[in-house]
């Protein structure tokens, strides 16, 4: 099933140069826009103390997710779909390990941590994470399961970092603590 879904999505690559440019943009440049936009949003927060708290939780969650993804890739290497001769590769990845997707893990941790503070922004960042993951499958550098696993791992880490922060530093006012 993983391979079937991959081939269906990857078959969209190479059909139209403009579509390929958009895929490349969402897979490689769009993530920087999301990070920059989030940084501006959190740094210019009207309540500086809450903005600093939100920034600390979100950055910690994203960094922890990135570290976990790197660790899994190191200990459980899994080749990218680009090793198949039928794969249409639109760009070259940084490394040859695909599981889990570091991008999916990182960008799933952001909305998971943000959700508890800024639900509307978290929704848009979750949509951004979906676009990034889809583009990385279409671009031929990730299997669908790599992306799905990244979303699950990132979501758990994002929520977990929020939970740990609340346990040690926050007032237990959120409904999950009641």
Where are the predicted features?
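Membrane-interface elements of multi-pass transporters and channels
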Residues: 12, 16, 45-49, 74-83, ...
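Membrane-helix interface segments
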Residues: 18, 49-54, 118-124
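Alpha-helical transmembrane spans of integral membrane proteins, capturing the lipid-embedded, hydrophobic core
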Residues: 29, 33, 58-66, 70, ...
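Interfacial segments of alpha-helical transmembrane regions
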Residues: 36-68
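Alpha-helical membrane-inserting segments
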Residues: 39, 64, 68, 72, ...
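Small-polar-interrupted transmembrane alpha-helices in polytopic inner-membrane proteins
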Residues: 59-73, 123-136
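Membrane-embedded catalytic cores of phosphoryl/pyrophosphoryl-handling enzymes
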Residues: 91-178
């Amino acid at each position: 099933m993983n391979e079937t879904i991959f081939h269906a999505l990857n078959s969209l690559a190479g059909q139209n140069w403009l579509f390929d440019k958009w895929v490349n943009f969402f897979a490689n440049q769009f993530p920087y826009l999301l990070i920059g936009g989030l940084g501006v949003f959190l740094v210019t927060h009207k309540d500086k103390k809450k903005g600093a708290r939100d920034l600390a939780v979100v950055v910690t969650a994203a960094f922890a997710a990135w570290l976990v993804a790197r660790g899994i890739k190191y200990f459980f290497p899994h080749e990218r779909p680009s090793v198949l001769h039928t794969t249409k590769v639109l760009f070259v990845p940084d490394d040859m390990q695909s599981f889990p997707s570091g991008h999916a893990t990182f960008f799933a941790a952001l909305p998971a941590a943000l959700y508890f503070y800024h639900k509307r922004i978290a929704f848009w960042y979750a949509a951004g994470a979906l676009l990034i993951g889809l583009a990385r499958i279409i671009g031929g550098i990730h299997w669908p399961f790599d992306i799905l696993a990244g979303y699950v791992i990132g979501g758990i880490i994002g929520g977990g970092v929020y939970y740990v922060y609340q346990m040690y530093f926050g007032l237990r006012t959120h409904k999950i603590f009641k």
